[in-house]
Structures are given as structure tokens and as C-alpha cells.
Amino acid sequence: MTRNFRERKMPGVEIARIAELLDPIVVAERQLEQISVYLDLLLKWNARMNLTAVRDPEQIVLRHFGESLFAARELFPDPDATGSLVDVGSGAGFPGVPIAIERPGLSVTLIEAHGKKATFLKEVVRSTRLTNASVQAIRAEEYVGVADVVTMRAVEEFASILPVSARLVRPGGRLACLLGSPQAAEAEGVIGECWRTERTVYFPGSTQRVLWIGQRAQK
């Protein structure tokens, strides 16, 4: 008899433990299974290429998955939300892949110029059966199209991302960045007339990490 997937062990973290670590974010069983498969792949690939500096599996769940799922719910409170999202410089897939898992009604495009990382992302999409996500192995400047929301993390110079973001986000759409609090403070001084800060929210349990959400001007 097949055991409930919550009881099965994965090479990284048991599925039931993933659910505990993500608490108070409650994740459906199907999504937990996808997260577990994703985490397993990330740990295997990270052993031979630099996808994330965080090596401890539980810390990956707490920080990377926790922050990404929090962002999903802040950006799209409705579980049945639809629309388009582009994740720029997706790298290991955060926050784009967890958002696609958490909000299956969205159309999510993962942009990653680094060939090996793009290959990893394609394997994640295939293995987790993410029918609402696709990968483009290009630079953000080469992407054709606009989205309702653009997401980014590991932003080094906030001012440098704004011109590219303005081209990718539809008028009235949003840019969401996972930042350190000093970078969020920097954002206020450089966003210019094209953007306005919608809100800045600290991630649960953190005084250093924030989700900055800006809205593009209508014109």
C-alpha cells in the first residue's frame, strides 16, 4: 500500500517537516509535494553548481520558500488569481517557481540568461509538472512582452533595474523585489516618476528582509 505522501521521506526534508517549517503559511498537499520535488532537485544540482549560498535544507525552506510563498500571497491574495508574472534573473527559481506552485492560475515566465541555470529551471518545471510556468534562456532586455507583475530578488543596485522593469511591466502593473531593508530604503530615493511605492512589508520573523512592491504609472 502506498503511504500518504506526507509520510514519505525525500533526500532533503520530509514533506511533513516542510509543512511545519512553512507554518503559519498553510500549503495544500499537492503544492507541498511539488515543493518537495523542487527542493530535492535544488539540493542535488546545488552540489555541482552555485544555485544558492544557503546549503542547509531547512534554511532553504524557511528563507527561500517561505519568502516566496509570502510574496505570492501578498501579491495575489485570491488563490484563484489569474494574470501574468515574469521573474527576472530567476537563478534557482525564487520567487518565481514557488509563486507558480502556489497560484496555479497565473502564467509565469522565468527569465534566466545563464544557460546551466536555465537548464535547471526547465528540469524543475518538468519534474514538478508546472503547466503554468515556462523558462526563457535570455537576458531581461531581450524579452518581448509585458506582464502584470515582475519579480526580482538579490538586487544589488536598485536604480539599475528600474529601466528594464518599466519596459516589462504594463502601465498600472507592479514590480515586486525581495530586498534587504537598506535596499528598500534606497528605493524611495531612486524610483522617480515612473513608479510609486505601493507598500513595503517585512517578511515574518525578520527585521532585515522586506518585500518591496511598486506600481508603474499609468502613463
UniProtKB/Swiss-Prot annotation:
It holds the Pfam family GidB. Its main location: cytoplasm. Gene3D superfamilies: Vaccinia Virus protein VP39. One of its GO terms (molecular function) is rRNA (guanine-N7-)-methyltransferase activity. It is an enzyme of class 2 (transferase). CDD domains: AdoMet_MTases (cd02440). Disulfide bonds: none annotated. S-adenosyl-L-methionine binds at G89, F94, A140, E141, R153. One of its GO terms (cellular component) is cytosol. Its EC number is 2.1.1.-. InterPro entries: rRNA_ssu_MeTfrase_G, SAM-dependent_MTases_sf. It comes from the Bacteria. Keywords: Cytoplasm, Methyltransferase, rRNA processing, S-adenosyl-L-methionine, Transferase. SUPFAM superfamilies: S-adenosyl-L-methionine-dependent methyltransferases (SSF53335). Belongs to the methyltransferase superfamily. RNA methyltransferase RsmG family. Specifically methylates the N7 position of a guanine in 16S rRNA. PANTHER family: S-ADENOSYL-L-METHIONINE-DEPENDENT METHYLTRANSFERASES SUPERFAMILY PROTEIN. This is Ribosomal RNA small subunit methyltransferase G. It comes from Koribacter versatilis (strain Ellin345). The gene is rsmG.
